[in-house]
Amino acid sequence: FCGTGMSTAKLASQNPKALVIGIDKSADRLRRHVQTQSRNYHLIRGNCEHIWAQLVSASVECVQHYLLYPNPWPKKAHFKRRIHGHPSFPLLKQLGGAIEVRSNWKIYVDEFAAAAQLLGLDTQVESLSATDPLTLFERKYAANSENLWVCRAAPA
């Protein structure tokens, strides 16, 4: 999800006392990252579901999760590839903390909110104004005047 690490670096600079971890499957995207002055972040190549499972088994508690512009897998046959349709989705709740999902697909954000509510999380969906984009996708979508959406979920 972290792509080239732009969002990870931005979140680290905005939260200097936090350890920020960015995860992406693509070595190519991670290689394109330009290190910033912030030293409180790391980029990891891997699958989120495997890393979440390891963190849960190690009893790690998180403060905040950002799931930024995930592949929406628009075909019905691919529902289980969506974060909220994957069997590992409950691990996010087990890790604790608030969750923020951003997408240019409103249905994706609405589905995520409904699934998070089934886990017992409080959710709020609203439009997003990308005046200071967190990701390259967010920058591109905002430049193309696409509607952006955010779901914020937190323990009830």
Task: Identify the function of each model-found stretch.
Residues 1-5:
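Class I SAM-dependent methyltransferase "Motif I" SAM/SAH-binding loop
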Residues 18-21:
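Short beta-strand element of Class I
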Residues 26:
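Conserved SAM/SAH-binding beta-strand->alpha-helix loop
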Residues 34-59:
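S-adenosyl-L-methionine
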Residues 64-79:
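A short SAM/SAH-binding and catalytic strip from SAM-dependent methyltransferases
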Residues 84-98:
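A short glycine-rich, Lys/Arg-flanked "PGG" loop and its adjoining helix->strand segment in the class I
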Residues 108-115, 119-156:
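Class I S-adenosyl-L-methionine
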